[in-house]
């Protein structure tokens, strides 16, 4: 809802019956729309009730067969001032050998995040930064002095995690398994263009990091592509334009 308030859309909050565990309804121009913010690939049971369902973490393989499910960019920034400040103050130059992996192991990702951190520490020692930053601004400023950020997704191993999405928005090159996701505007994430892909079991992660050391200009280009993708698809204005374009299509 903060996206709509930022683009100065008047909002009226009303109490409505619950829809699902990870969904809510919104009415725009007298049309009832479903927002599905689940991290998972589940489908709302009463999907046929809605002409449009905007789905976070939309994948072509799981959702394209449903004509009323529309891709939607997942949550990135709650405070958009941090994004605007970050665009001015965060400058990814890839001029350092520090490798970022600032994710706390937990939930569905506890095993793989612990395994990846152990792998990175064994190989790179004190060149790995695994600190957890309580302040978002501190987390973003780590970008200024890193080689690359290794991102291990949370609920699923092939989903776009919020931290990775924020880093992409600010122009940092990231490494993760293949992200089978489509953002608002119907634009897919593309490996080697918007991020560097590694195997799902991270067995080639060290190889990918070593590649970054040898191709720093390419890393900068990937980070820039990611930032441009975010600006095109996932800012409040871009998302609102996408919503309007789908509502007007009948």
In which residue ranges do the predicted regions lie?
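C-terminal "capping" alpha-helix adjacent to the active site of nucleotide-linked donor transferases
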Residues: 196, 201-218
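Nucleotide-sugar donor-binding catalytic core of glycosyltransferases
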Residues: 1-191, 233, 237-241, 245
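A charged, aromatic-enriched C-terminal amphipathic alpha-helix characteristic of glycosyltransferases
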Residues: 217-247
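Short, contiguous hydrophobic alpha-helices characteristic of membrane insertion segments
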Residues: 174, 193-201, 246-250
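Alpha-helical packing segments of well-folded alpha/beta enzyme cores
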Residues: 116, 139-142, 208, 222, ...
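Hydrophobic, well-ordered secondary-structure elements that form the walls
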Residues: 167, 195, 226
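Short amphipathic alpha-helical surface patches that serve as generic macromolecular interface elements
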Residues: 161, 192, 202, 206-209, ...
